[in-house]
Regions:
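Bacterial Sec-dependent N-terminal signal peptides
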Residues: 1-20
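Short acidic catalytic loops
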Residues: 127-131, 152-163, 218
Length: 311
């Protein structure tokens, strides 16, 4: 029995050491970023930086997986400033990726990101949206919510606790907010496929459209990614008043890749290109029309909505 235990622990240690092979992890990560990051020159710069640090033994001091992952993330971000880049060591996350099961998100409580849907006094619709879930998953919640809200005389979209999600939910919601003509919302460039994709509203998705209803979007410095796209789209189309704080500044969508073992990197493979500005909000965020602390944004929006409706 004693020999068995010694052998068991030896094998376990061997597997653990193999999973934490720094050379393998760095070389694989460098290759992933070089071949996939949306800007090739920055992908190469990240590759060169971490390979150089590996060769000069600068990663030798990291003896835990989580600390090593954090160091790699810091190094990659030092080149790009891209907050969509994330390096983690997480067994459950890695297994979900292998199984194409990305785990619980805003849908796990059955609300699919639609945290609160209500009509405020004065017939002002209010949506506290915590995530832009894929419409294919969330339609049974999203459609009744928007069908209810579009009956209001003004709308408030609260994105202060929204970290992003899917462009097709942006398209779905936006389709209620314009007229019968399709509106170009956004374009994405995807480096790995070297292709462009466009997002347009589709009036047929909405039970009713109200192109003139006053819209207010609430933001915070937590508002990120797809939540920023929704905000940026409506701002530049002059379709909404943005109230709150400058957003987080993430305009490079992508997805996770297994590096080795349970090490995972989120790789920004694309970039948003707004059809009006010809650029995006990466690194700068979306600047609100009316700057107030996030906690005061709802109060300000209600005030403005009442003034607008009482004209």
């Amino acid at each position: 029995m004693k020999k068995f235990l010694v052998l068991f622990f030896a094998v376990t240690a061997s597997v653990s050491a193999q999973d934490f092979d720094k050379k393998k992890i760095v070389r694989r990560l460098a290759k992933i970023m070089n071949e996939n990051y949306v800007y090739p020159e920055k992908g190469k710069a990240m590759h060169d930086l971490i390979i150089s640090k590996l060769k000069s033994n600068q990663y030798n001091s990291y003896d835990s997986e989580s600390a090593f992952a954090a160091a790699l993330e810091t190094d990659l971000r030092s080149v790009t400033g891209d907050r969509h880049i994330r390096v983690t060591h997480d067994h459950a996350h890695a297994e979900n990726i292998r199984n194409r099961d990305f785990g619980p998100g805003p849908e796990s409580n059955g609300k699919f990101g639609f945290e609160e849907v209500k009509i405020l006094p004065g017939n002002v619709g209010y949506l506290d949206l915590r995530g832009f879930m894929d419409i294919g998953i969330a339609e049974d919640v999203a459609k009744p919510a928007m069908d209810k809200l579009i009956q209001a005389d003004a709308l408030i979209f609260d994105l202060r606790k929204n970290g992003g999600g899917s462009p097709n939910m942006i398209r779905f919601i936006s389709s209620y907010l314009f007229g019968d003509e399709k509106v170009h919302l956004n374009t994405f460039y995807w480096r790995p496929a070297d292709r462009y994709s466009e997002t347009w509203t589709d009036p047929e998705l909405a039970s009713q459209t109200k192109p003139d209803i006053p819209i207010y979007v609430l933001t915070s410095d937590y508002t990120f990614s797809a939540a920023e796209e929704f905000t940026y789209n409506l701002k530049n189309l002059e379709r909404a008043t943005i109230i709150g704080e400058t957003t987080g500044g993430g305009a490079h969508p992508g997805g996770p890749s297994i590096i080795s073992g349970d090490f995972v990197v989120n790789v920004p493979r694309g970039r948003a290109i707004n059809p009006i500005t010809k650029t995006n909000w990466e690194g700068v965020g979306v600047i609100p029309d009316i700057k107030v602390p996030a906690e005061k944004a709802l109060e300000k929006a209600i005030e403005l909505a009442k003034l607008e409706l009482n004209k």
